[in-house]
Amino acid sequence: MAIKIVMLKSLEDVIADVKEMLSGDSVIGYTLINPFTLTFREEAQVKFYPYAPLSTDKIIPIPSDWVVSIVEPMEEIKNSYLENIDGKSESTDS
């Protein structure tokens, strides 16, 4: 698993298992597996919401031109995400 935070042009921060989509040697996009949008709340709380909550898709392709940056999540955020995808809740605080 490559758990990363993907920062999108839409100003959303999405945490997911991220895979590159290739065409030859070029990255044309990313596949987000079990993506969740991160929101920041008061007192440094992070809340997880399903990305595309009206869809049953668990794998969502994103074109590379929509990605601003991909970063490594803090360990606490990564652990909360992993708990979330294990089916413990639909949205959680960290």
Model-derived regions, located:
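Conserved RNA-binding domains used in RNP assembly and mRNA/RNA metabolism
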Residues: M1-S94
